[in-house]
């Protein structure tokens, strides 16, 4: 009897191996209007990274995570209007955030994302205190699917190799 045991990569891979990086957080002091322009501009303003993600971490002066802001937030503010003097930090204060850590297992984070129906999660490097933790990446559902797709490709390649070996062995008899 031949039995194969498969190791689930979600249970051995660390988040650091699957997260998108580098992260370009937005400062909490940025005005709402500037954030709307960032998300809606066809090209990035001079000296800034292009808005290629759907959401970004918002950090304080000490680079501590305080919120996440999304393109959907910016579009909602465009439609409903916004206080031109309000900052991202003021607008997003009290946001309930799901975070991950770079040393965490991908499977644990995927479970928490599924339970919270979270599409994107900021990833932190652990500091001595929560305030000292810094944002080092983002994990989106597509990053988790990429891990799963890699496993499927490896399994398909392995099956083809086994079939080829079986065919070669049958010819030699």
Predicted regions and their residues:
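ABC-type nucleotide-binding domain
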Residues: 56-57, 69
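Membrane-interfacial segments at transmembrane helix termini in multi-pass membrane proteins
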Residues: 1-27, 151-173
């Amino acid at each position: 009897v031949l039995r194969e045991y498969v190791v689930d990569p979600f249970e051995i891979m660390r988040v650091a191996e699957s997260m998108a990086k580098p992260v370009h957080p937005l400062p909490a002091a940025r005005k709402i209007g500037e954030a709307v322009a960032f998300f809606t501009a066809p090209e990035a303003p001079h000296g800034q990274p292009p808005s290629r993600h759907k959401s970004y971490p918002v950090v304080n002066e000490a680079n501590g995570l305080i919120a996440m802001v999304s393109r959907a937030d910016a579009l909602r503010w465009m439609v409903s209007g916004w206080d031109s003097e309000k900052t991202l930090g003021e607008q997003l204060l009290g946001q309930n955030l799901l975070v991950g850590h770079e040393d965490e297992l991908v499977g644990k984070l995927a479970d928490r994302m599924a339970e919270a129906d979270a599409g994107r999660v900021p990833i932190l490097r652990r500091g001595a205190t929560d305030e000292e933790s810094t944002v080092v990446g983002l994990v989106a559902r597509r990053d988790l699917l990429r891990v799963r797709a890699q496993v499927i490709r490896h399994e398909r390649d392995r099956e083809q190799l086994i079939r080829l070996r079986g065919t070669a062995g049958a010819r030699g008899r």
